[in-house]
């Protein structure tokens, strides 16, 4: 390369870096409204305008108490006491203290009535008991929660209330706040999965533990955990009450005072509380156009504390999307009586503007990081993963379960890597991006509406123009320049490769059917040891083979050798279809059979 060409490249690189540094230090600027509008247009095309937001709104204690009275169809002494306690709640800590003690007294009275009754399933008594105990726990001070005890007055007698979590019964709970799930109104989820039974249905909030080796894999927002609170032991003469927080996904029945009780639980509220705290409308935009600003949001995130006995379901979203696209599927898995005991949901979020091979390398590094973190924490390794990918996420998933051989390299270059002009860092980058093997920690894959042979949508003017707005991190730009531009004379002579040598391609460019990545990814074979399933949208077309979901053609989403295939009469947002959810639940239950388990 001539010195003048090198100077021009260096000037362009500096200008690009300056543009990135000026772009959105804290959010989108006024001058970027055109890009935001373009992002929203792309989102409408890619996601079909499907709603992905979750909203959680608190309900007042009085409104919830009134609803309980109306639901019971009668106003008894207990329902009246419940309403009176609710009326006391307010912003005054002293008044809340009185309400707290009234809730506790009411919960104890109803618990005594339930134990004395022959019929344990009295819905009115159970409702009042559960909500009174839930409201009591919500009013506990942070100081009481921190030490796991509270001094209370019951019938004029001083009582020590001891709070314990069933996960670690010998230690105080590590929760920062307890929220009564019944007092939250949820919008944005198709269903709310609640199991009736004994127990105050709680959302237990927990700040990510920054010391733990697994802290980087907890959700950036407060972790929300489902628990059901019960009176494990009540001894008023001795001045002691023990309240146990039970994980309802693991415990369906509990023995108290010599009798077995069905444990209730709210399995949707904790996930809704997580989803309502995210700001993915701007993060999706940054993930496509301004990847440097998405760096602190990338990664694999556990939606619940790690459990080595549960199988991870790892969900990978597509271009210009976010984990919230999986909200209803995640909710159904968490609400299913069988799957909630056997599976834990993990979400992978990433900047979707990166070249596809780069995004795949980052996912492999994240999976390796999880394994290393578990080992450092002294925890057992995770169960074999069920990997689910939609659209671009399906391409990443396929690269986790395939052997690249030389297929990808040969689409770009005519000579082996050792004949290129590469620095050691570039050689390492090439080795990890263009060459890979099937992972041994994945047991099954589900591909949804994935463009294995590319998508003609990427050739549309709107998408081509959008790709010009994508800005890579400087380090990646320099890798791409040194690997491709410096070695252009060794590249396979094609229109697409000439474009790559001239301008760094985004994921949008590389989704075009003629791109070298699309050609290579279409040739990759899923490892025979890993069963896979297809879910394909087929809304448009005169026949199955000529149909498409409006974005991806059936012929591009189809892979030979699938264990099953479901063709859904819907658009590209096939993830939102109840038929898709039913199929995923079927596959997950199939995966539980002994012959389908293991690495």
Task: Map each language-model feature to its residues.
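Serine-dependent carboxylesterase/thioesterase catalytic core
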Residues: 88-89, 93-101, 105, 112-124, ...
């Amino acid at each position: 390369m001539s010195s003048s060409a090198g100077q021009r490249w260096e000037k362009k690189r500096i200008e690009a870096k300056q543009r990135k540094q000026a772009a959105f230090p804290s959010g989108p600027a006024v001058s970027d409204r055109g890009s935001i509008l373009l992002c929203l247009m792309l989102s409408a095309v890619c996601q079909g305008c499907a709603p992905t937001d979750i909203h959680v709104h608190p309900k007042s204690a009085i409104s919830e108490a009134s609803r309980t009275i109306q639901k019971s169809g009668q106003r008894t002494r207990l329902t009246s006491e419940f309403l009176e306690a609710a009326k006391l709640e307010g912003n005054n800590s002293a008044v809340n203290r009185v309400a707290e003690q009234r809730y506790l007294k009411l919960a104890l009275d109803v618990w005594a009535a339930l134990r004395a009754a022959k019929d344990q399933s009295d819905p009115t008594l159970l409702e009042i008991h559960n909500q009174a105990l839930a409201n009591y726990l919500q009013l506990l001070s942070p100081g009481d929660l921190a030490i796991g005890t509270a001094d209370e007055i019951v019938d004029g007698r001083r009582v020590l209330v001891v709070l314990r979590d069933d996960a670690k019964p010998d230690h105080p709970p590590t929760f920062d706040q307890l929220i009564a799930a019944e007092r939250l109104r949820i919008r944005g989820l198709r269903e709310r999965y609640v199991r009736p039974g004994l127990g105050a249905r709680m959302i237990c909030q927990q700040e990510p533990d920054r010391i733990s080796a697994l802290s980087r894999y907890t959700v950036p927002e407060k972790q929300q955990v489902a628990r059901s609170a019960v009176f494990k032991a009540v001894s008023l003469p001795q001045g002691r009450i023990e309240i146990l927080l039970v994980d309802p996904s693991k415990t369906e029945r509990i023995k108290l005072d010599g009798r077995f009780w069905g444990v209730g639980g709210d399995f949707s509220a904790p996930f809704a509380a997580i989803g309502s705290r995210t700001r993915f409308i701007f993060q999706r935009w940054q993930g496509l156009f301004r990847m440097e600003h998405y760096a602190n949001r990338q990664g694999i995130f556990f939606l619940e504390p790690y459990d080595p006995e549960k199988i991870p379901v790892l969900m990978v979203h597509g271009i210009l999307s976010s984990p919230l696209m999986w909200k209803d599927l995640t909710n159904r898995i968490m609400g299913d009586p069988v799957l909630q005991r056997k599976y834990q949901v993990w979400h992978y979020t990433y900047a979707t503007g990166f070249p596809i091979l780069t995004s795949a390398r980052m996912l492999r590094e994240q999976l390796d990081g999880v394994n290393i973190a578990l080992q450092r924490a002294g925890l057992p390794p995770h169960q074999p993963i069920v990997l689910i990918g939609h659209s671009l996420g399906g391409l990443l998933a396929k690269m986790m379960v395939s052997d690249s051989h030389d297929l990808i390299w040969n689409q770009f270059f005519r000579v082996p890597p050792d004949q290129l002009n590469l620095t050691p860092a570039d050689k390492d980058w090439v080795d990890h991006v263009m060459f890979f093997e099937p992972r041994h920690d994945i047991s099954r894959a589900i591909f949804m509406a994935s463009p294995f042979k590319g998508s003609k949508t990427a050739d549309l003017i709107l998408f081509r123009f959008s790709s010009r707005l994508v800005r890579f991190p400087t380090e990646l730009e320099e890798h791409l320049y040194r690997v491709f531009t410096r070695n252009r004379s060794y590249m396979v002579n094609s229109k697409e490769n000439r474009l790559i040598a001239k301008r760094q391609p985004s994921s949008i460019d590389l989704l075009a059917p003629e791109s070298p990545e699309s050609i290579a990814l279409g040739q990759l074979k899923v490892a025979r040891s890993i069963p896979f399933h297809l879910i394909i949208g087929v809304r448009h077309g005169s026949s199955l083979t000529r149909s498409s979901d409006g974005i991806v053609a059936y012929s591009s989403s189809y892979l030979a050798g699938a264990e099953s295939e479901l063709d859904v009469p819907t658009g590209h947002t096939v993830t939102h279809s109840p038929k898709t959810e039913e199929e995923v639940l079927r596959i997950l239950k199939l995966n539980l059979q002994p012959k389908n388990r293991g690495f």
